[in-house]
Every structure is written in C-alpha cells, then in structure tokens.
C-alpha cells in the first residue's frame, strides 16, 4: 500500500492591520492543531509571518514566533527581519506549498487582498475567494445587499465621501444621525474587525468624538441604532453544501461587546444558546442564505442580534476569517458540534480541496 504524501500547509499570519496581534494568537492555535499527533501524519506546516512593515518573514523565524522563542513585539526590523525577509514573487519559499491557510484578520488580508495575491500561485486556499472576502469585510456593502434581500437588520445610516475635517460637515452629520436614529447608536468604520474603531454613543455630545475615531480607520462610516439584544453567533463550513454549527450566545460583562470584551474579559459563553428551536432554525437558515448571497464559502462566522423584548432576529455581520484564539467563538461552536480543533483544521483543508 502506497503511503499518501503529506500535504504542505502554508500558514500566513500577522499583517499590518490593527488586528496583527489577534492574527498571531489565531495562528498559534492553528499551528499547534496541525502539529498534533493525529494531524502530523497528514500535514506539514510552513509558516509565513508578515510583520507590521509588510515584510514576509521566512519559516524559521515565523515558527519561532509561533512557539514563543521570539517575541515579535520586541524584535526590531533592522536587527532580525532584514536578514530573514523573503520575496513572494521569487517563489522559492513557496514551491512546496500544497494549500494556503491565510489567517490575516482585518484589512490587507481578510478583505480579499491576500486571496488575490495567493491566486497567482495557482494553489488552493482555506476560506472563501476574493469577492466574498471583500463583501464580508465591508460593512456598508454587506448591509446594502442584505437590505435588498429584505433580511432583517437594525436601522442604520451610511456616511461616506464626507470631509470630517470640516466642522460644518460634522455638525450636519450629527443632526442627520439624531434625526434618523434613536440613541444609543454604534459608530463603526466600514472596514474593520474585532470591534476596533467602534464606539457606543448614548447622547449627542459624544457623537463627534465617535465619528472622528471611526474616520481614523476608514473614511466610510456606518452608524447603527442600538437595541436591547442578545449576541448570537453561528459557524459555517462547506462549499457546495454549507453546514451550520450549534448556535452560541455571548454574555459580556462590559457595557457592550468591544475589543476588550472579545479578547481580555471573562465572558459567559453558552453553546448551544438557550433559545427556541424555531428561532434556532431561522438563524441557521439566514446564516446559509447570507453566505450564499455574498459568495462566502470555506468557513465563516455569522453574527446576529436577538431582540430581548420581541425575540426578533437581526443579522449583524459575517466574519470570513473568524478568530481561532483561546477565547474565539468559532472553534468553540464547532467543538460543541462534534469537531475539536484538530479535526476542524483538517476538515477545513479537506473542504478547500473538495475531498
């Protein structure tokens, strides 16, 4: 019997988005899962760290970052990275890669940028393609498409092509927000993840600062009306057939589900969420419908709001490269659905190869 050749996984992480550190944490989890006893029989992993300058770092240094031998925050570019940089277009480091596993959260990664680059290698990758990634990252475009499909969402207002350096423009926008939406509102950059750049605003006086904070990340801004809701999440994997995980709920100790709540706090996670079976079915159906509409496949996490007073479902957003950190919901959802992290990463590779 001929032994099957191991697949070489090209694990890409880091990047120069503001979610750089989250990407490293996710990559550590995935790297360890591929190097488990069961997966070592099927896979080899080559790691490629992209530092905050945009340099690609070779496998030796990248692995040392993942296993903790090098602290990336304390490493100066001139002292180490200049000697270990690689040129993506040369292709030497990438010749033996069978499949890519990009874990770049945020812009220049999750937005489809890395997917477009990797397409030139003519190798499959874990996750969805350029279009689905770009639409999933852009909150405004995503919500516009969902509105056209009559998928329920909270009331929102779009701000784009406005000069927020102009005081008159800012005052006009504040008046428009107050006129169209009820407080509290959430002010969000259109292209950002992990709740970075987002502010909860409870009155007029705080709107200006929130708009400026979002504008620092993206000139296109989304303002959403805040409701009393539960945070509900659903995992998706698959290609032609999309499978849904158990439904999970996050109860956070802070005022809202901000960056610190996602990664630094002790939130209460309930999987499966304690909700009616009919509502669970509707959430899963909307999750599949929304992913199909945006051409999202491979894997994703779909986030919902469930209004406390009415049990009305609102689609929030789709995350096309959800976190794999120790506090991330996506791997927890699938573990509760029968796939531990070692099985999950292997399954994602199989899906991308259509096995």
From Swiss-Prot:
Gene3D superfamilies: 3.40.50.20, ATP-grasp fold, A domain (3.30.1490.20), ATP-grasp fold, B domain (3.30.470.20). Residues 143-350 form the ATP-grasp domain. ATP binds at residues 178-233. It comes from the Bacteria. Its main location: cytoplasm. Pathway: Cell wall biogenesis; peptidoglycan biosynthesis. One of its GO terms (cellular component) is cytosol. One of its GO terms (biological process) is peptidoglycan biosynthetic process. Keywords: ATP-binding, Cell shape, Cell wall biogenesis/degradation, Cytoplasm, Ligase, Magnesium, Manganese, Metal-binding, Nucleotide-binding, Peptidoglycan synthesis. Mg(2+) 2 binds at residues 317, 319. Pfam families: Dala_Dala_lig_C (PF07478), Dala_Dala_lig_N (PF01820). Binds 2 magnesium or manganese ions per subunit. Belongs to the D-alanine--D-alanine ligase family. PANTHER family: D-ALANINE--D-ALANINE LIGASE, D-ALANINE--D-ALANINE LIGASE A. This is D-alanine--D-alanine ligase. It comes from Prochlorococcus marinus (strain MIT 9312).
């Amino acid at each position: 019997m001929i032994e099957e050749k191991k697949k070489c996984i090209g694990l890409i992480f880091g990047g120069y988005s503001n979610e750089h550190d989250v990407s490293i944490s996710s990559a550590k989890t995935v790297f360890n899962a591929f190097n488990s006893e069961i997966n070592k029989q099927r896979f080899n992993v080559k790691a490629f760290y992209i530092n905050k300058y945009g340099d690609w770092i070779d496998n030796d240094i990248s692995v040392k970052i993942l296993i903790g031998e090098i602290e990336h925050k304390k490493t100066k570019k001139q002292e180490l990275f200049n000697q270990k940089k690689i040129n993506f277009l040369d292709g030497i480091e990438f010749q033996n890669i069978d499949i890519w596993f990009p874990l770049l959260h945020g812009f220049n990664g999750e937005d489809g940028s890395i997917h477009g680059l990797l397409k030139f290698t003519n190798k499959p990758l874990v996750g969805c393609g350029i279009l689905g990634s770009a639409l999933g990252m852009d909150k405004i475009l995503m919500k516009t498409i969902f509105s056209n499909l009559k998928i329920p969402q909270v009331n929102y207002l779009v701000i784009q092509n406005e000069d927020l350096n102009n005081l008159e423009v800012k005052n006009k926008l504040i008046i428009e927000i107050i006129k169209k939406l009820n407080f509290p509102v959430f002010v969000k950059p259109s292209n950002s993840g992990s709740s970075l750049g987002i502010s909860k605003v409870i009155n007029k006086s705080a709107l200006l600062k929130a708009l400026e904070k979002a504008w620092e990340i993206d000139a296109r801004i989304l303002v959403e009306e805040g409701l009393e809701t539960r945070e509900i999440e659903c995992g998706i994997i698959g290609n032609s057939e999309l499978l849904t995980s158990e439904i999970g709920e996050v109860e956070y100790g802070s005022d809202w589900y901000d960056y610190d709540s996602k990664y630094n706090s002790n939130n209460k996670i309930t999987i499966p969420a304690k909700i009616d079976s009919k509502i669970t079915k509707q959430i899963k159906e909307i999750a599949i419908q929304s992913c199909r509409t945006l051409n999202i496949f491979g894997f994703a996490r779909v986030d919902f709001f469930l209004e406390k007073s009415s049990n009305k479902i609102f689609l929030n957003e789709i995350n096309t490269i959800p976190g794999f950190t120790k506090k991330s919901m996506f791997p927890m959802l699938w573990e509760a659905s029968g796939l531990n992290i070692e099985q999950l990463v292997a399954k994602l590779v199989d899906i991308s190869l259509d096995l």
